[in-house]
């Protein structure tokens, strides 16, 4: 799981629960829990882990956008995270929002970031140590040094490439959302004026990439899953989208890190943007 270089040890983007347990006391690592249900952390979490709230801390609170550079610097500084800290993320719901946080951190240039395979579910299933103590760490002065714009897509880029054979779109929502029977999963508040999908998108629900225990499926299974729909490594660009950008971060992680696709982007505007756009092309019904 580690690549030893001359002076540092580079941690792989995906680590096991055992690796995490072995590194609980490593001062260069900060464990961060990011849950869909933000009350989960208080019921028990990995010792030493801090929590990020996806609703209030990872999104702009006024504009429809990701957290600003300044707010991210403040969040990381307050949690004692420096530019060279290895951030190890995990969460509930098979790492939905942990993957979103990883995408966001990489977008803002923090490369030393990993995901615990299986997330919170696997950690608890293995009866590993938890605590209800909330740790505090000495503040740092975190500074973003670069922004990786090539990890993010937007509506205008997608519109221009809709008929491009070298471009692949993956809609990772449920089949019911894809065909246009429903606009959002039951109980979710963010919806859209229109239901359906972006023309040409292939429907590969995010959950098809994970096994029963919440870990990712094998590389061979994943290759068959995406390759079977024509979402292959030889595409010039692959873009994943969902409803608000969190489920698609999960698929983005699979394509980029587990399958090694060169150019994968997350369209975080996703259906809550596209389904509300005046004049945007939409399709309903099953894949052509």
Describe each model-derived feature in a short phrase.
Residues 262-288:
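Cysteine-dependent PTP/DSP-like catalytic domain, specifically the C-terminal lobe
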Residues 66-167, 181-182, 196, 243, ...:
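Thiolate-centered catalytic microenvironments shared by cysteine-dependent enzyme domains
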Residues 41-48, 102:
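Glycine-rich loop at the start of a catalytic domain that most often binds anionic cofactors/ligands
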Residues 43, 125, 276:
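Phosphate-coordinating loops and pocket residues in cytosolic domains that bind phosphorylated ligands
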Residues 2-39, 120-193, 282, 287-288:
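Flexible, polar/low-complexity N-terminal or interdomain linker segments that lie immediately upstream
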Residues 56-87, 202-237:
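Helix-loop module immediately N-terminal to the HCX5R catalytic loop
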Residues 169-225:
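A mid-sequence, solvent-exposed acidic-amphipathic segment
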């Amino acid at each position: 799981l580690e690549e030893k270089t001359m002076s540092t040890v580079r941690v792989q983007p995906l680590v096991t629960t055992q690796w995490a347990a072995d590194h609980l006391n490593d001062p260069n690592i900060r464990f961060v829990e990011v849950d869909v249900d933000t009350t989960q952390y208080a019921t028990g979490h990995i010792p030493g882990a801090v929590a990020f709230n996806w609703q209030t801390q990872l999104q702009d609170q006024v504009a429809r956008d990701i957290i600003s550079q300044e707010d991210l610097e403040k969040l990381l500084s307050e949690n004692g995270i420096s530019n060279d800290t290895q951030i190890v993320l995990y969460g509930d719901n098979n790492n939905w929002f942990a993957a979103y946080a990883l995408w966001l951190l990489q977008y803002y240039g923090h490369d030393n970031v990993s995901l615990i395979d299986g997330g919170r579910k696997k950690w608890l299933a293995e009866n590993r140590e938890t605590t209800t103590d909330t740790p505090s760490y000495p503040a740092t002065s975190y500074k973003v040094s670069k922004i990786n714009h090539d990890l993010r897509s937007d509506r205008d880029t997608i519109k221009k490439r809709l008929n491009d054979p070298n471009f692949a779109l993956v809609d990772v929502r449920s089949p019911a959302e894809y065909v246009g029977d429903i606009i959002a999963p039951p109980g979710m508040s963010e919806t859209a004026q229109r239901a359906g999908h972006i023309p040409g998108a292939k429907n590969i629900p995010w959950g098809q990439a994970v096994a029963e225990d919440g870990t990712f499926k094998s590389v061979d299974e994943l290759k068959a899953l995406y390759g079977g729909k024509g979402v292959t490594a030889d595409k010039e660009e692959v873009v994943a989208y969902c409803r608000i950008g969190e489920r698609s971060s999960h698929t983005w992680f699979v394509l980029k890190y587990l399958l090694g696709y060169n150019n994968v982007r997350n369209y975080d505007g996703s259906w809550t943007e596209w389904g509300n756009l005046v004049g945007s092309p939409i399709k309903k019904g099953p894949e052509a």
